[in-house]
């Protein structure tokens, strides 16, 4: 039995209870830090448990069960819906909406790995924390983008597997990620886990 990250609050005692209930895998919620995940895993001495963390897509912690608009086909995300009041504001909003739609149209044509949430740079830390499985979110994504996400995650895992421990710590892993996944361009800076928390 796999326990969804949508269960919300997770702590050492909760993991112990779920282990006693026969849960085989704990999926950590996006809001947990790598440090917290490590502490929980170490505290329960969980030899028979598997642990899963988010690796790509959907940075927002409310995207799953806690989003009131995601599963409604008739409307988009409420947090991305524009609102306006008076006539002057309406004119400004129309210009903003037009520009936003133009930018979104351009962005839809440009694939960027992890543009809605990424933890590829945190893979060595997730591994060291005891994470045994990774979650790649696919809901709401284009099939072509999902295929590229899968290839990129596999490539990142290949880089990680090929690196020696010392090289990961000196940043060689990040350099290779930038070259192989991001083609030398900067990443989207949409880190699921705070980039400074595990340094």
In which residue ranges do the predicted regions lie?
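Active-site pocket-lining/capping segments in soluble small-molecule metabolic enzymes
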Residues: 1-9, 13, 21, 27-199
């Amino acid at each position: 039995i796999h326990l969804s990250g949508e269960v919300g609050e997770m702590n050492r005692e909760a993991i112990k209870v779920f282990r006693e209930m026969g849960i085989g895998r704990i999926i950590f919620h996006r809001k947990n830090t790598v440090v917290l995940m490590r502490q929980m895993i170490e505290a329960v001495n969980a030899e028979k448990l598997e642990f899963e963390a988010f690796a790509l897509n959907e940075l927002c912690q409310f995207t799953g069960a806690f989003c009131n608009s995601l599963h409604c086909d008739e409307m988009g995300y409420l947090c991305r819906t524009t609102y306006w009041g008076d006539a002057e504001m309406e004119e400004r909003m129309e210009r903003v909406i037009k520009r936003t739609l133009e930018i979104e149209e351009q962005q839809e044509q440009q694939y960027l790995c992890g543009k809605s949430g990424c933890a590829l740079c945190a893979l060595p830390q997730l591994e060291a924390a005891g994470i045994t499985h990774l979650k790649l979110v696919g809901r709401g994504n284009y099939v072509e983008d999902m295929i590229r996400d899968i290839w990129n995650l596999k490539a990142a895992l290949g880089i990680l597997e090929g690196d020696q421990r010392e090289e990961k710590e000196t940043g060689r892993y990040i350099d290779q990620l930038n070259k192989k996944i991001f083609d030398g361009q900067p990443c989207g800076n949409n880190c699921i886990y705070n980039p400074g928390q595990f340094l």
